[in-house]
Amino acid sequence: MSDRIEPKRYDETSPRYAGWRVVLACFLVALFLFGFGLYGHGVYVAELQRLRGWPAALISGASTLTFLLSNVFATFTSELIARFGPRRLILLGIAALAASTTLLAFAREPWQLYAAFILMSFGWIGMGTVVIATIVSFWFERRRGLAISLAFNGASLGGVVVAPILVLLVEEVGFSAAMLTATAIMVVILVPVVVAWIGPRPPSADPAERETQYSSSSQMPAAATDISRAIIVRQLAFWTISVPFALALVAQIGFIVHQIALLEPKIGRPGAGFAVALTTAMAVIGRLCLGMVVDRLNPRLVTAASLASQAAALLTITQTDNPTVLLAAGAVFGFSIGNLITLPPLIIHREFDAAAFAVVMGLSSAISGTVGALGPGLVGLVRSWSGGYAVPLAICITLELVAAVIVLCGGQKQHTIATV
């Protein structure tokens, strides 16, 4: 008798479907990764400056190095998933992130600081958006958009949950003890969840796809590591995904980083702080709302609409000092923030072979993430040159609109990528 499991259709709408436990696991992975690996950086800069007397430029340089390395390494995520399997790769990412935050707690020399942030970049590789999107996509077809949206909501909540808890712990027990305590909490929660819930996907009802599932113990298609990146970058569809999201991230990250400095003269520091909280909250709501309907929509059209709404919100901010209108504009901007993470994998799934997903996603994320990291610096430089935020915001609006036009230039044709 054959040991091969016969395929059947799984009800992705059922709460008992195992894929939803995978989504919850990925949600928690994103929460801790973005909490420690992104939103926690503000805590590290402030505390290490105070405790060690290091200049902000030194610490910020280490922080920037993390994002640059993680974006470069994201290109090779498909090979790592194929080599280690999703579960082991995430566990390695957790180990790297935990080692990073532990080293930060004991860092006394600049080289230790940089070693910690380099380790953090490996945490991003093992736990990042490409890995999460790939794992969730294993388990969902008809409800893929909702599943990815829910998983990525952990990224937004990382700023709402992890960063404030870090601040409170630092005030109570000091920076070193706070980092060790928070790291222990992360490991105790994530390791059992990942071990228990992230495993092989269920067998597909598609016979052709079923063959690829049994070709690798890591559950990656056998040809995933043979996909030609040279062929991918010659596809127009690839660039109509990567370029618009890169331009949009420049504008989005630039605005987010400078939001308090921009709004404080208009509505005061408490008002600016509330605006940031409102923007973050709307990012969570927006991703949830999108997830409910995106599986029935064209993700390119949704992307263009999201970018146009952000451009309109920024234009409104440049034209008024009214606190209510400014808060409303910030809410509109925030509503689509999270969607710029959710939408790329949905477009890629529609337009590229399933076997090429991790490769295309890794390449696209590397490009958009690296370019997007320039946003805060660009906005800051133009502000210093122009003496205000009117010109930087005009540039951001232009980038958003150009991105909206480019993303509409792509189509829904399925692109077959040759192997090497």
Show which residues each predicted segment covers:
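Extracytoplasmic gate region of multi-pass secondary transporters
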Residues: 41-45, 234-288
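Intracellular juxtamembrane helix-capping segments at the cytosolic ends
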Residues: 126-140, 339-352
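C-terminal transmembrane helical hairpin of 12-TM major facilitator-type secondary transporters
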Residues: 279-283, 289, 294-347
